[in-house]
Amino acid sequence: MNTIFTIILTITILVLSLILKDLLFEGRIKKINKLIPGPSTIPVFGNLLQINAKDFPKSVNDFYERYGKVFRLRLGSVEIVVLTGPEVIDECFNKKHREIFKERYIKFSRFLGKDYNIFSSNGDYHYVLRGILTSEITTRKLNNGRLESNKFILEMFSNLCKDNKETLVKNTPNQIRILAVKLILNFTLGIEENDETILIIVEKIKCIFEAAGLLIYSDYLPFLFPLDIKSMSKNDIISSYFFIKDFIGIKLDAIKIKYEKENELKNETTDETSSKLNNIPIIENYYKNYLDGSIHYDSILFSISDIIFAAVDSTSNGFSLLIGQLINKPEIQDKIYEEIMRNDENNNTNNISFADHTKYPYIISVMNESYRYNSSVPITEPNKTTEDVEVNGYKIAKGTMIIKNLRGTHLSKEFWGEDALEFKPERFKNQPLNQKGLFHFGAGARACPGGRFTESFTFTFLVIMLKNFKIVNPTDIPIDVEGEVGLAMQCKPFDALFIKRN
């Protein structure tokens, strides 16, 4: 009884102290940012209680519609400025203020990997980790078969459809996830796992991304950590994360033994061996950098985890949402098929590579519109200002958390006109991939380093799939293409009828 009383008394004193601090003390960041428009706050919690914990992006976008392209929030003890719109984001992250906005804001829940992974590290070390990945997904390497997309895509259709004229594919988004896991495990670890392990990994990644998209209260008020731990345990997010990390650790142990036995890095290599080294899985390149003293050992595990999580979930969900759009709008499928056939004089489409994408302008417009309409990440991981800066007439203090509102940026009528909520590829007619105004891979120095992977996967899959199949809705109910909130938007399950073309 005395213990319970002590805990209650301690919490009460802590809360009262925070209220007094909030009312009586005005820190530098708060003093500067208070002139930026935004909703009124309450002591200690700020605007935290005004946020929908299950749909943080919607809450942010609702505030944008009320307060404009630059507005202020205070969630708990954290000062936040939200930016919306192509011009504002471009100015801050790509142009005038690029250097000021390039650091990642490390939230409480990301603290574990802050010095070790691509996602949350800062400074020169971040660019070392990032550089190892980007060196492996250059356009040249992707075009030369660095990804074995075609092989895995054709295997998927062969297994699902066999020799049937029509095949009902149950839970199509899950089949896309399975394909993405197979591809990314081959790309990062150089392995082809059995189906049982693949299905477990699919479920673990899905669990992590669904739960991680929910509001984590201790990111803004650390004393609420016990509440979040209870929620995370219920959602199995912690056990799922460590399952993936341990899985990678086993593969890394095998690589360590291999290098110790063969001592490959100390021997002169023939041209043939050099060629093989250029195509080794990414985890081996991280391990080589560890042996050179460039990175920590734990950075291999954390970075490969980052790559697998991001590539599988955002890529597969984005593509599944696109399939849903194509089912709802069969006329777009027809136009894509016509373009494929115009370019397929030698009946060689199944061997297509990303190098061919410029020959398919309509497919590029469909991809651009998909990136706009179905932003895989509606609210990006936050950055922070490294010095005071003026944006859109408002002064933002050094150390402020910066959030990019991609849902509003990509779907607001203010930027895209009255038809902003329509899926309309023609708005990107004759424009290149990654058209100006799209920030689906983020922006600036911290833009997603795996963007080319997603583009290559999407283009290759789209061409092979629609060359060989027409995709039809087996019911009269349109596919739900809005997605559910997660760290990346989650495509809801749907069935699709794949009809072989002649």
From Swiss-Prot:
It is an enzyme of class 1 (oxidoreductase). Its cofactor is heme. Gene3D superfamilies: Cytochrome P450. InterPro entries: Cyt_P450, Cyt_P450_CS, Cyt_P450_E_grp-I, Cyt_P450_sf. It is found in: Membrane. GO terms for molecular function: heme binding; iron ion binding; monooxygenase activity; oxidoreductase activity, acting on paired donors, with incorporation or reduction of molecular oxygen. Heme binds at residue 448. The chain crosses the membrane at residues 4-24. GO terms for cellular component: membrane. Its EC number is 1.14.-.-. Keywords: Heme, Iron, Membrane, Metal-binding, Monooxygenase, Oxidoreductase, Transmembrane, Transmembrane helix. It is a single-pass membrane protein. Pfam families: p450. Belongs to the cytochrome P450 family. PANTHER family: CYTOCHROME P450 514A1-RELATED, HEME-BINDING MONOOXYGENASE FAMILY. This is Probable cytochrome P450 514A4.
